[in-house]
Design a protein with these regions (language model features):
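Conserved N-terminal phosphate-binding loop of PLP-dependent enzymes in the Aspartate aminotransferase
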Residues: 1-459
C-alpha cells in the first residue's frame, strides 16, 4: 500500500476541525495525530502500518469488534435497494420497522415505542422535548426543570451540553443553561466522609437530590437523567442501593427518570440494558453506540407505555407532533442495526461482556491496585478504570498541569494498546469491544501495568 500518511496528516492539520481536540496544538503540529486505515476484531491499524489493540472500542461503541462482514454486507445491500426515505407522516422502511421491533423485544419491561436519531446528543435533545411536551399536555407547564449529575455525560449540544456535568463541555460555551440543575455524583471513591458505607453514601446522594427538589419546588421538577454507570465522568459504578434510593425520591415527587444508555445499552455491562442490570425503572431510555456498534450513525429514544399514552393524547388535542430529523430511521443505519443485533445474539456478546469483564477487572486489580499511586481500580461489565492519586492515604489529586492520565495513556499506546485518559481527573479508562477474549484482556493488563510503572518511575 502506498504510504500517504504524511500527505494525509498535512491535510488533516490544515483542514480538519476535530471534536474534543486542542485546536491550536493540532493545527501547529504540537500534538499527536493518527490516520486510522483499517480494523479487525479488537485491533485497528493506521496508515503507517502500526497496529493497536483498541481497549476503548472507539468511544465505547464498536461492541461487536471491527471488520464484521455481515454488517458491511447489510449496509451495502440496503444502499443498493433503497438508500434513503424519510420517516415523516407515517412512512417507514422494512429495515426501520424490523429494527424497532427488535429493540422493543430486548428493552426493559414497560417500554413501548422507539424514536430514531443519529447520535446520543440528539436523542437526549429529543428526550427533553418529549418531557416538556408531556407535562404541557398534562396541564403542568411549570414542571420543566431537569436534574442531572456532576460528572454525568449526556451530549455536547446546548441542552445536552447543559445536562453534561463536566467542565470541559461548559467552558466558554455559556453552559449550563436553565432549566438544568446538577446534583451529587455517586462517586464512592470521592465520598465526603470516608467512614460511609456504600448504602450510607447512596442515601446521602438521595437526600441531596430530595433537598434540591424541595428547594426548587417539586411542581417545577420534571425529570432526572443519569447513566446507569458514569462513563466519561470516570467510569464510576453506582454504590449499592443507589438506584433504588434515587427511584424512591423520584416516585415520591412524580418525576420522570431518563436512563442514558448510550454507552451501556446492548450488552456493555453483561446484560442487554444497564437499567435491568441495576434495577432502574426508566420512563425514557437513550440508546446509540451499541445499537449499530458504530458501523453507521444511529440513536434512539425508547418511550415507556406511561409516556406514550400521554403523547398520543397530545396528538389528539394538537395534531401531529412537531419534532423530526431528516435522517431519523435512516434505512442504511437501520440495516446496520439489524445485522449488529443479530451478531450480538449469534456470538454471545452480552454473556462474554459479563464473564470476560469480570476476569479483566480482576486481573487489572491484581496487576496495578497495589501501586503506590493507584487509588482505585473499578468498573462493571466490560468497563474499567484506574484512578491515580498523589497520596494513596488521603486520595490527594495530582496537580492538573502534570497531566498524569494523558501520560499513562500515551505510554500505554507505545505498548500497542489504546486506553482513554478521562477528561476530568487522572483516570485511565477501558471499554473494549465486547468480543474481547481472555488472552486479549491479558495483553491489555500487561501493557497497563508496564505503562503505569514506567510513568511513575519518571515523576
Amino acid at each position: 500500500m502506498l504510504d500517504r500518511s504524511n500527505e494525509l496528516t498535512a491535510w488533516d492539520r490544515d483542514h480538519f476541525f476535530h471534536p474534543s481536540t486542542h485546536m491550536g496544538g493540532h493545527a501547529r503540529g504540537e500534538t499527536p495525530t493518527r490516520v486510522v486505515a483499517g480494523g479487525e476484531g479488537v485491533y485497528i491499524t493506521d496508515t503507517t502500518g502500526r497496529k493497536s489493540l483498541d481497549a476503548f472500542a472507539g468511544l465505547y461503541c464498536v461492541n461487536v469488534g471491527y471488520g464484521r462482514q455481515k454488517i458491511a454486507d447489510a449496509i451495502a445491500a440496503q444502499a443498493k435497494n433503497l438508500a434513503y426515505y424519510h420517516a415523516y407522516v407515517g412512512h417507514g422502511t422494512e429495515a426501520s420497522i424490523k429494527l424497532t421491533k427488535m429493540i422493543i423485544d430486548r428493552a426493559p419491561a414497560g417500554m413501548s415505542r422507539v424514536y430514531f436519531g443519529l447520535s446520543g446528543s440528539d436523542a437526549n435533545e429529543t428526550n427533553i422535548k418529549l418531557i416538556w411536551y408531556y407535562n404541557n399536555i398534562l396541564g403542568r407547564p411549570e414542571k420543566k426543570k431537569i436534574i442531572s449529575r456532576w460528572r454525568g455525560y449526556h451530549g455536547s449540544g446546548v441542552m445536552t451540553g447543559s445536562l453534561t456535568g463536566l467542565a470541559l463541555f461548559h467552558n466558554a460555551f455559556d453552559l449550563p443553561r436553565a432549566p438544568v440543575l446538577h446534583t451529587e455524583a455517586p462517586y464512592y471513591f470521592r465520598r465526603p466522609d470516608q467512614s460511609m458505607s456504600e448504602e450510607q453514601f447512596s442515601q446521602y446522594c438521595a437526600d441531596k437530590l430530595e433537598e434540591m427538589i424541595i428547594a426548587e419546588g417539586p411542581e417545577t421538577v420534571a425529570a432526572f437523567i443519569g447513566e446507569p454507570i458514569l462513563g466519561t465522568g470516570g467510569i464510576v459504578p453506582p454504590p449499592k442501593t443507589y438506584w433504588q434510593k434515587i427511584q424512591a425520591v423520584l416516585d415520591k415527587y412524580d418525576i420522570l427518570l431518563v436512563a442514558d444508555e448510550v454507552v451501556t445499552g446492548f450488552g456493555r455491562l453483561g446484560t442487554m440494558f444497564g437499567s435491568d442490570h441495576y434495577g432502574m425503572k426508566p420512563d425514557l431510555i437513550t440508546i446509540a453506540k451499541g445499537l449499530t456498534s458504530a458501523y453507521a450513525p444511529l440513536s434512539g429514544t425508547i418511550v415507556s407505555n406511561k409516556m406514550w399514552q400521554v403523547l398520543v393524547q397530545g396528538s389528539d388535542q394538537m395534531g401531529a407532533i412537531g419534532h423530526g430529523w431528516t435522517y431519523s430511521a435512516h434505512p442504511i443505519c437501520a440495516a446496520a442495526g439489524i445485522a449488529n443485533l443479530e451478531l450480538i445474539d449469534e456470538l454471545g456478546i452480552v454473556e462474554n461482556a459479563g464473564t470476560t469483564g469480570t476476569y479483566f477487572r480482576s486481573e487489572l486489580e491484581k496487576a496495578v491496585a497495589g501501586h503506590r499511586n493507584v487509588g482505585e481500580v473499578r468498573g462493571d461489565g466490560l468497563m474499567a478504570a484506574v484512578e491515580f492519586v498523589d497520596d494513596k492515604d488521603d486520595r490527594k489529586f495530582f496537580d492538573a498541569g502534570r497531566k498524569i492520565g494523558p501520560q499513562v495513556a500515551s505510554a500505554l499506546l507505545e505498548r500497542g494498546v489504546i486506553g482513554r485518559a478521562m477528561p476530568q481527573g487522572d483516570i485511565l479508562g477501558f471499554a473494549p469491544p465486547l468480543c474481547l477474549t481472555r488472552e486479549e484482556a491479558d495483553i491489555v493488563v500487561k501493557a497497563a501495568a508496564d505503562a503505569i510503572e514506567t510513568v511513575f518511575k519518571s515523576i
